[in-house]
Amino acid sequence: MWLAPEIPSEGWTNMVSEAGHNGHECGRVRRVPVYGFLILGGTHPVLVDTGYRDNAIMESLGMRGLQFHENMIENQLARHGLKLSDIRYICHTHLHIDHAGKDDKFPMNTTVVLNRREMEFSVSGIMYPQYPKPDIMHLVERIYEPEAIRFLDLEITGAEEIIPGVWCEAAGAHTEGSMNVIVETAEGLACICGDVIYDFNDQIVNHVYTNNHMEPRVTGNHAGSKRGEKAAIKKLLNNYKFLLPIHDRPAKIENQQVVGRLNMTVPGPMTETLPERHWFAA
């Protein structure tokens, strides 16, 4: 039995370029999607990331949220014949403002899965205010409810299975506790890689401000070293057939290169390239 990640679109946000691409077009504003991933075909439906709480909360980072009625997570799930209560597991690549904002819509018998180091890091103040209080307080409440949260210790244990065909591993990038979610598909391994990659065109394909052969460009929003970020991207390009970031369309990878771009289902219809993102006045 093969699994298929689907993309429920959870909205858009306007991001200052420096955050997404280190040193590139500083001060310009770029509109980016905020995706979640619904994994179907396994023993239980699994959701990866829940988007941001509402448009207003994005203003705390000076960003504009663009979340409409059709983007609401319950409406996106309904497109697949599912209710909030049908989701058995929510896996979080990390807990930033645009990734864990809807957990409180789900019942406590939906288990939220995250790397323990990410929970620790979220309350350290190091990347405040990217971890908003309402989102983190809800996760604290889940700690005291039976089976409502599952902590992984990926830096120590290595990969941990969630359901057959789906497992998590430490990302080693973006935040200190970020994790990747790996899915077995009929055409190879798909890796939901959070914010390790923001933009394939700038970071991988076009090598913006990068001179060395096979050298990826890191984002401008990370807690660790640039070498660590580069190594984490190289690991993704070396090990997986499909890469699914949260803020760009999925890509098919061969020989560490992007050979195609996919739409809302992986595996699925593919185009060779995608145009660069649109820019807006700051």
Question: What are these model-derived regions, one by one?
Answer:
Residues 1-56, 60-63, 235-239, 261, ...:
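Zn-dependent metallo-beta-lactamase
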Residues 2, 50-52, 95, 118, ...:
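Active-site metal-binding loops of divalent metal-dependent hydrolases
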Residues 36-40, 46, 55, 154-186:
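Core dinuclear metal-dependent hydrolase active-site scaffold
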Residues 39, 49, 87, 94, ...:
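Divalent metal-coordination and catalytic microenvironments
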Residues 44-46, 89, 111, 188-192, ...:
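Structural motif
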Residues 56, 68-82, 86, 116-170, 176-254, ...:
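Metallo-beta-lactamase
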Residues 63-114:
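Active-site metal-binding motif and surrounding structural segment of the metallo-beta-lactamase
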